[in-house]
Amino acid sequence: MLDLFNKTSQVQGRISAWLASNNLPHRPLGFDYQGVETLQIKPEDWPSIAVALYVNGFNYLRCQCGYDVYPGGPLASVYYLTKVDDNVDQPEEVCIKIFVPRENPKIPSIFWVWKTADYQERETYDMLGIVYESHPNLKRILMPESWLGWPLRKDYITPDFYELQDAY
């Protein structure tokens, strides 16, 4: 599994400094091209950090998605959180990345913190097979229930027996 916690740390931003001051384990990954601070969180630490971020004002889950890091490698779940407040022209944002092994990809669901995670976690489950533990309705949302495998994994092979039926 991709373990970035033991490598040299990146530049620490404001949110990373706040998490560190509260003894919340994370690893800063720097900033994206828009200046959004990116942090890596371990799956087991995610529920407590999610609640801490919510209490600190990150009241909106703007986006949750997942991706296959590389063939045979770990899977990633990504969360973009935003502080939505009155009279703010430039809301504060943070990007959280959680890496899990593809053999047993489990992450605690944050549906109980941000309800907008409902369909987004289901879609990531449907496409990549990341299991969001304690999600109230984790089942396929885009693919038929009978679909085999996880279509967005880089090692996915399309089964021969699926056909387009009544597609027109």
Swiss-Prot record:
GO terms for biological process: photosynthesis, light reaction. It holds the Pfam family Complex1_30kDa. This is NAD(P)H-quinone oxidoreductase subunit J, chloroplastic. Its EC number is 7.1.1.-. Coiled coil: none annotated. InterPro entries: NADH_DH_suC (IPR010218), NADH_quin_OxRdtase_su_C/D-like (IPR037232), NADH_UbQ_OxRdtase_30kDa_su (IPR001268), NADH_UbQ_OxRdtase_CS (IPR020396). PROSITE patterns: COMPLEX1_30K. NDH is composed of at least 16 different subunits, 5 of which are encoded in the nucleus. One of its GO terms (molecular function) is quinone binding. It is found in: Plastid, Chloroplast thylakoid membrane. One of its GO terms (cellular component) is chloroplast thylakoid membrane. The keyword Translocase applies. Keywords: Chloroplast, Membrane, NAD, NADP, Plastid, Plastoquinone, Quinone, Thylakoid, Translocase, Transport. NCBIfam families: PRK12494.1. It is an enzyme of class 7 (translocase). It comes from the Eukaryota. It is a peripheral membrane protein. Belongs to the complex I 30 kDa subunit family. It catalyses: a plastoquinone + NADH + (n+1) H(+)(in) = a plastoquinol + NAD(+) + n H(+)(out); a plastoquinone + NADPH + (n+1) H(+)(in) = a plastoquinol + NADP(+) + n H(+)(out). The keyword Translocase applies. NDH shuttles electrons from NAD(P)H:plastoquinone, via FMN and iron-sulfur (Fe-S) centers, to quinones in the photosynthetic chain and possibly in a chloroplast respiratory chain. The immediate electron acceptor for the enzyme in this species is believed to be plastoquinone. Couples the redox reaction to proton translocation, and thus conserves the redox energy in a proton gradient.
